[in-house]
């Protein structure tokens, strides 16, 4: 008969200490080894936030209903454990083992599950019912999580939410994903052989390297998804080598249009370039171009026309986007730390005028914008949920109609900025 592993039978504190948790884990270890005095870890509805179980053996342990936000669970073994309705948001689950674990109703939003093993785990809906209320159960939430290289072979994940998750090279073979939501997720080179995907939503997903034959016929919504069949125009089809076109473009900029020619890469798939770090591409035109995952650190793209471009998961730290048109561009999971989206100023009719950066209708979910400058930037009707604007200069920016759910604004300058509801800073 399982016994809670509470030392000396004392009641656990509301917020458990690391030393108390370590003591329980040691008792559980003895239990799993069949040693005298061992007790199975049964911790239910406790607050373990911020603690560590790194590399610990927690097979068959019970953490049902626990708050486990921001915990370091990397390398831990939760094989056949119960994490029913747990809150694992922002936890480090790198290479964590959840084989045959009960994760029904768990909330795993923004967690790092890179290399985690969830083979045959139960990821169906779940929730707690009390005498006062009935909870029909919530779906497992992986929104924005990093599942790169994770194994979910044979898992039960009907109606699970993987929106905006990083799922490159994930193993979903034989998984039950009926009704699951993958909108905006990166499934590059994912293995979906034998997966049940009836009714799944894969709108705007990245599916390059995925066998579409394993998806077709399942009633999956692939609207606006990127596949090997529609990646866009190839740079191989350019009439002139790209290096020469860039040279002509820079000459065009330097002579204010008198010589050379503006570079137009609209509709091209540029991911094959891998890196444009430090490049000077002022006034580039690239409407609807695809840059996903590229290293563009310190790139100069002032006064460029980049609306509807896809910058998901790009490294754009220190990038210069001043006065650039970025309407309806995608930046989810992009690294935009210390980037500059400020205006450029020019003289016209004896007056100083500002050319601002426009990001109306853009998607910046989960983007890291810490320390960036967005002075007078227009974010009208943009989706900025979970974006990190810590320490940003947002003076005079326009957030009218923008979704700022769970976005971080700690230490941000918001003087003169327009919000439907001002955020806490």
Where are these regions (language model features)?
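Tandem repeat scaffolds
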Residues: 9-22, 29, 33-425
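N-terminal acidic, proline/glycine-rich, low-complexity intrinsically disordered segments
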Residues: 1-7
């Amino acid at each position: 008969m399982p016994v809670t592993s509470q030392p000396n039978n004392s009641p656990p504190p509301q917020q458990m200490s690391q030393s108390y948790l370590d003591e329980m884990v040691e008792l559980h270890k003895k239990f799993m080894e069949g040693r005298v005095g061992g007790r199975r870890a049964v911790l239910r509805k406790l607050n373990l936030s911020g603690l560590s179980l790194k590399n610990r053996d927690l097979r068959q342990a019970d953490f049902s209903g626990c708050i486990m936000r921001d915990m370091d669970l990397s390398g831990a073994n939760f094989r056949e454990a119960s994490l029913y309705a747990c809150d694992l948001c922002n936890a480090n689950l790198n290479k964590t083992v959840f084989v045959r674990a009960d994760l029904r109703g768990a909330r795993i939003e923004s967690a790092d599950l890179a290399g985690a093993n969830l083979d045959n785990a139960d990821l169906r809906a779940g929730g707690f019912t009390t005498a006062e209320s009935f909870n029909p159960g919530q779906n497992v939430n992986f929104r924005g999580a990093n599942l790169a290289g994770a194994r979910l072979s044979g898992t039960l994940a009907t109606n699970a939410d993987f929106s905006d998750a990083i799922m490159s090279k994930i193993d979903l073979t034989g998984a039950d994903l009926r009704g699951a939501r993958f909108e905006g997720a990166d499934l590059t080179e994912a293995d979906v052989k034998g997966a049940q995907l009836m009714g799944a939503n894969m709108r705007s997903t990245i599916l390059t390297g995925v066998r579409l034959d394993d998806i077709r016929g399942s009633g999956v919504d692939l609207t606006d998804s990127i596949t090997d069949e529609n990646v866009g125009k190839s740079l191989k089809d350019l009439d002139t080598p790209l290096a020469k076109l860039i040279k002509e473009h820079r000459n065009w900029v330097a002579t204010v249009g008198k010589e050379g020619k503006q570079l137009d890469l609209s509709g091209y798939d540029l991911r094959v370039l891998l890196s444009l770090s430090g490049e000077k591409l002022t006034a580039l035109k690239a409407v609807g171009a695809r840059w996903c995952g590229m290293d563009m650190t310190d790139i100069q793209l002032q006064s460029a026309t980049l609306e509807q471009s896809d910058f998901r998961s790009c490294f754009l730290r220190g990038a210069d986007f001043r006065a650039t048109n970025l309407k309806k561009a995608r930046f989810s999971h992009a690294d935009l730390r210390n980037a500059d989206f400020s205006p450029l100023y020019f003289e016209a009719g004896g007056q100083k005028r500002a050319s601002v950066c426009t990001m109306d209708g853009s998607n910046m979910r989960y983007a890291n914008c810490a320390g960036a400058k967005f002075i007078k930037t227009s974010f009208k009707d943009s989706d900025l949920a979970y974006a990190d604007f810590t320490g940003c200069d947002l003076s005079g920016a326009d957030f009218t109609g923008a979704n700022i759910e769970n976005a971080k604004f700690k230490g941000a300058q918001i003087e003169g900025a327009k919000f439907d509801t001002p955020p806490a800073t």
